[in-house]
């Protein structure tokens, strides 16, 4: 293979990335990249042939050096960053600046982290005289970073006794039916044990896992790296350079920069797709019966065909028992039953018509989305409106959580940096940011936030707290040759203008205040309080379904809450496992922890946000404390229930519906639970929230259309720099030109059948929704939009970019 052939082959491989089988947006991306590359290669060959006319002997060296440079910065996923760069190369040259003498550097710093996924390929597997074939062509690649299991179905048994399987990602807990597979094979005289079958599955699953990134500025990055590489080559080379040699190096630079320009053109296009605002989809509302004040609408709900499915859901969630009938709904104890409009879509507008300031009357928003896409899309609507943000991100431990939790440190930093920065943009000027980490990530985490806030406090959460401070809990880990880890770290971040409520607590073992696990909120009686009697102390709770502050008479010793929280039970306590164990207990945080965070940094109806929502503890606590809330989560555990290997578990929507019903003693699935906080604040139920999905990067890639026509209809010196995607359709299939009436019609159903136009426009424009009517959305600024005859100019950022 000549060096020229080697270069073009390598360039194609590294630009397009490893071949991925299956379906979805990333498959469409590979097709688009391949078409783009084929045209670029033709133009590049012409330019190289012209450039080396005077120096034919330099041709092989040119290709050798081009290959040597570019192969350092490309990965199996097609991402562009430091990959196999030799350590001695000066890639850390920008450590110091005039303002700072220490800067954290990591090799994926210039990238958007997209997801971690395995690149599956169809493959044969043979061992112990058995032959298998796994067809990966139907695997629909992951949209984001959720964990998803594979499941296998028999496709056929071939004449040579090769057992062929179709492989897919599991949907809603679908599992491989090994027993049925073994029975089918036995009928076909294929002798195989369950152990050998599982071994074959494991062999297939051990395919390469890669991180997918997008370079934020590929052109600047690669040009900078080429300059560093060429300067090093220049100064370490000959002491004297002939004119011809200088000209050859100029040719090398010129060609290298053309390659860089064409690579960055496409990478920049991906950046635009990644950052484009996303459509809100598949939206519904959950509202308790007591909030539906029009009895005629309630009667319509009770007579609606969807009431059967609604009751079935309540039964699955444990809200009502199997004997529950429609006639029972009139009972006073069921006034907080959560009605989901997905079962009553034709009544949804009637229900919404009861509210004259819709967004302000909602208690919260649940958003199913990868969190970068969610934060970026809702930023115009919620910019500087969030009072407190709490996140409990993956700690980089590899534990068995429902999301990927094993990253290279550099990938984790890239994942967190952009999401933290976006989250901060949503905070009010007096808002606070809470970052919850363990010892695997707290050092890196603090580096990401230290320049974002004027004040950063460090709180130690004692995960081994007991009722008796002298006592301790221990298990098998206690006997290891190390100091047992018994804490996690909370970084409490704020600026000079902040809202903070001072909390006090009694001695939990001896107190007679009767406040349960609650803290006391201190309110100064005078301008400069210096002693306890200078304060009034109150607790927040519900009285007769009204939330407010209740005075507490202090007649015993109390203590200010410090920065070591050793009085909050974690899930090492059996009491917590019984009362609050909803789902993935190993990573779930106690409600009392979130209660303290929320009460210290917000007031009633302030917005609380968590965009690593997990099982929904933050939104559950915020709701019970009469705060508005935003929760972002992805994957199957966003739903009411989701399947695990150990059975069904309560999901985020299920938990929030349970909260709306009042956190009453509900059997899920075999024990009765009611969180301590619900008793302490006298929570009885009620609420109104919206949930929806967002279009994902993967969805957008799947729907984007790029033509195979001539990209370079007019060649020029700027052919590599000019924006070449101007003629491409992208997502313009949603538009139809009515030439007769000189109008542009918008049909968003051509993209997705379930777009929520009102929420999409609210996120896009930043305007809050006042009312939604048939064919119209009204915003709080008085403006109205006809949703049946949309002006294409309004939605342009969603479907076309340049």
Each PLM stretch: what is its role?
Residues 1-352, 363, 379-383, 387, ...:
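Accessory, often C-terminal, charged low-complexity segments
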Residues 214, 218, 367-371, 408-416, ...:
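Phosphate/oxyanion-binding active-site loops and adjacent basic polyanion-contact surfaces
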Residues 373, 395, 441, 613, ...:
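Short, glycine/acidic-enriched loop or turn micro-motifs at the edges of active sites
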Residues 367, 434, 611, 631:
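Conserved SAM-binding loop
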Residues 395-402, 469, 572-576:
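Short acidic/His/Gly/Ser-rich catalytic and metal-binding motifs that mark active-site loops
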Residues 381-399, 608-622:
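Conserved proline-anchored active-site loop of SAM-dependent methyltransferases
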Residues 355-377, 574-607, 613:
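Glycine-rich adenosyl-nucleotide cofactor-binding module
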Residues 387-389, 393-415, 419, 430, ...:
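Mobile active-site "lid"/loop adjacent to the S-adenosyl-L-methionine
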């Amino acid at each position: 293979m000549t060096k020229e052939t080697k270069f073009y082959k390598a360039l194609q491989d590294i630009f397009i990335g490893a071949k991925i089988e299956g379906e979805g947006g990333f498959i469409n991306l590979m097709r688009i990249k391949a078409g783009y590359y084929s045209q670029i290669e033709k133009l590049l060959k012409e330019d190289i042939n012209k450039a080396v006319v005077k120096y034919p002997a330099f041709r092989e060296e040119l290709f050798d050096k081009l290959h040597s440079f570019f192969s350092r910065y490309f990965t199996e996923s097609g991402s562009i960053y430091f990959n196999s760069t030799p350590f001695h190369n000066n890639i850390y040259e920008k450590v110091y600046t005039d303002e700072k003498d220490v800067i954290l550097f990591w090799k994926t710093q210039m990238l958007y982290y997209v997801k971690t996924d395995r690149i599956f390929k169809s493959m044969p597997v043979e061992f112990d005289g058995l032959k298998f074939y796994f067809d990966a062509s139907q695997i629909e690649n992951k949209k984001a970073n959720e964990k998803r299991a594979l499941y296998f179905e028999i496709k056929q048994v071939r004449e040579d006794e090769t057992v062929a399987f179709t492989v897919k990602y599991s949907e809603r807990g679908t599992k491989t039916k090994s027993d049925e597979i073994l029975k089918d094979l036995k009928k076909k005289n294929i002798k195989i044990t369950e152990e050998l079958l599982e071994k074959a599955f494991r062999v297939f699953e051990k395919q390469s896992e890669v991180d997918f990134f997008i370079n934020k500025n590929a052109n600047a990055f690669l040009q900078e790296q080429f300059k560093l590489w060429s300067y090093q080559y220049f100064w370490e080379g000959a002491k004297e350079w002939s004119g011809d040699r200088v000209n050859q190096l100029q040719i090398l630079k010129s060609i290298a920069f053309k390659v860089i320009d064409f690579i960055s053109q496409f990478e920049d296009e991906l950046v635009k797709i990644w950052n484009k605002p996303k459509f809100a989809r598949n939206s519904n509302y959950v509202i308790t019966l007591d909030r539906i004040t029009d009895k005629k609408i309630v009667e319509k709900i009770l007579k609606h065909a969807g009431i059967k499915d609604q009751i079935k859901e309540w039964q699955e969630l444990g809200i009502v028992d199997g004997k529950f009938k429609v006639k029972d709904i009139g009972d006073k104890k069921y006034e907080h039953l959560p009605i989901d409009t997905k079962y009553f879509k034709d009544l949804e507008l009637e229900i919404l018509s009861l509210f004259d300031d819709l967004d302000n009357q909602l208690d919260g928003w649940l958003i199913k989305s990868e969190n970068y896409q969610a934060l970026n899309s809702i930023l115009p609507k919620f910019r500087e409106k969030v009072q407190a943000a709490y996140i409990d991100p993956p700690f980089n431990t590899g534990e068995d959580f429902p999301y990927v939790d094993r990253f290279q440190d550099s990938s984790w930093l890239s994942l967190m940096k952009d999401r933290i920065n976006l989250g901060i943009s949503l905070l009010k000027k007096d808002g606070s940011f809470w970052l919850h980490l363990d010892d695997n990530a707290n050092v890196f985490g603090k580096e990401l936030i230290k320049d974002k806030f004027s004040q950063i406090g460090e709180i130690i959460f004692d995960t081994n707290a007991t009722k008796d401070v002298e006592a301790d809990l221990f298990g098998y880990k206690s006997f290891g040759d190390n100091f047992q880890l018994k804490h996690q770290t909370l970084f409490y971040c704020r600026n000079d203008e902040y809202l903070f409520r001072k909390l006090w607590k009694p001695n939990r073992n001896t107190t007679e205040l009767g406040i349960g696990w609650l803290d006391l909120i201190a309110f100064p009686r005078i301008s400069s309080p210096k002693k306890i009697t200078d304060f009034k102390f109150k607790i927040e709770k519900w009285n007769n379904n009204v939330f407010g502050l209740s005075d507490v008479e202090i007649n015993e010793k109390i203590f200010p809450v410090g920065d070591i929280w050793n009085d909050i039970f974690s899930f090492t306590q059996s009491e917590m496992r019984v009362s609050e164990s909803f789902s993935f207990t190993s990573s779930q945080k106690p409600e009392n922890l979130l209660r303290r965070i929320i009460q210290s940094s917000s007031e009633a109806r302030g917005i609380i946000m968590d965009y690593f929502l997990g099982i929904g503890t933050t939104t559950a606590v915020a709701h019970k404390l009469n705060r508005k809330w935003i929760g972002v989560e992805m994957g199957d555990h966003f739903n009411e229930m989701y399947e695990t290997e150990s059975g069904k578990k309560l999901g985020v929507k299920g938990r929030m519906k349970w909260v709306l019903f009042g956190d009453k003693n509900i059997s899920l699935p075999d024990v009765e639970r009611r969180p301590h906080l619900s008793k302490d604040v006298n929570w009885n139920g009620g609420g109104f929230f919206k949930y929806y999905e967002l279009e994902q990067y993967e969805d957008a890639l799947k729907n984007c259309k790029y033509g195979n026509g001539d990209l370079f209809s007019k060649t020029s010196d700027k052919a590599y720099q000019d924006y070449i995607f101007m003629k491409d359709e992208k997502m313009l299939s949603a538009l139809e030109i009515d030439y007769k009436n000189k109008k542009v019609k918008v049909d968003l159903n051509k993209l997705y059948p379930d777009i929520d136009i009102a929420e999409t426009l609210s996120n896009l424009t930043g305007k809050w929704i006042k009312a939604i009517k048939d064919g119209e959305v009204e915003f709080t600024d008085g403006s109205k939009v006809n949703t049946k005859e949309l002006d294409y100019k309004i939605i342009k950022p969603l479907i076309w970019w340049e």
